[in-house]
Amino acid sequence: MVQWQCNLRVSWRMQLFSLLAHGLLVLLILLAPWPDGYMSVWLGLVTLVMFGFIRSQRNIKSRHGEIVLYNENHLRWQHREWQITKRPWVLKNGILLSLRTTEGKGPRRRSLWLASDSMRNEEWRHLCHLLLQHKNWQSDRLM
């Protein structure tokens, strides 16, 4: 039986946060006083931060689509069945879910950040209510 379902959108707040965080890192690298001969280190660091930014944006953009919560610890997302393995970390702007697949293919474990702006306010409040009312999280692990 479906307790909650939603069509997740890409979170513009998470995209903006990623842009600001990576931009700040690049700015710090550029403004740091580098001695002569360290240009290769400087360029390497800027390149790593830029690739990290691209990877972050791809990850944020991949967190969309239909998600269905069947019960307190079982959900369907991206056409796969997942089990919530730890107590969800609920904040004002999002929920962090630790997931383990119940199917044998693909990555076995995944963390899923559900941003509050990736769904309607009513869906967000209902999901928070469902996850916070579940009292049987056994020492942060489900059996």
Curated annotation (Swiss-Prot):
Induction note: Transcribed under both aerobic (with succinate or glucose) and anaerobic (with glycerol with or without fumarate) conditions. Part of the sdhE-ygfX operon.
GO cellular component, one term: plasma membrane
Periplasmic side: 32-35
Ranges in the topological domain labelled Cytoplasmic: 1-11, 55-143
Traits of the deletion mutant: No effect on aerobic growth on succinate or in LB. 90% decreased synthesis of prodigiosin antibiotic, decreased transcription of flavoprotein desaturase PigA.
Main location: membrane
Keywords carried by this UniProt record: Antibiotic biosynthesis, Cell inner membrane, Cell membrane, Membrane, Transmembrane, Transmembrane helix
Pathway it works in: Antibiotic biosynthesis; prodigiosin biosynthesis
Signal peptide bounds: none
Compartment(s): Cell inner membrane
Parts of the chain that traverse the membrane: 12-31, 36-54
GO BP: antibiotic biosynthetic process
Topology versus the membrane: Multi-pass membrane protein
Record bears the keyword Signal: no
Keyword Transferase: no
Function comment: Required for production of prodigiosin antibiotic (Pig); overproduction in ygfX, sdhE or double sdhE-ygfX deletion mutants leads to nearly 10-fold increased synthesis of Pig. Overexpressing cells have somewhat altered cell length depending on growth phase. Does not function as a toxin; overexpression in the presence or absence of sdhE (the putative antitoxin) has no effect on growth rate.
Domain writeup: The intact transmembrane domain is required for Pig production, its replacement with 2 TMs from an E.coli membrane protein (MalF) does not allow Pig synthesis; although the chimeric protein is found in the membrane it does not self-associate.
Subunit structure: Interacts with itself, SdhE and as in E.coli FtsZ and MreB; other interactions are shown but require validation.
Descriptive protein name: Inner membrane protein YgfX
Species, as recorded: Serratia sp. (strain ATCC 39006)
Lineage, broadest ranks: Bacteria, Pseudomonadati, Pseudomonadota, Gammaproteobacteria, Enterobacterales
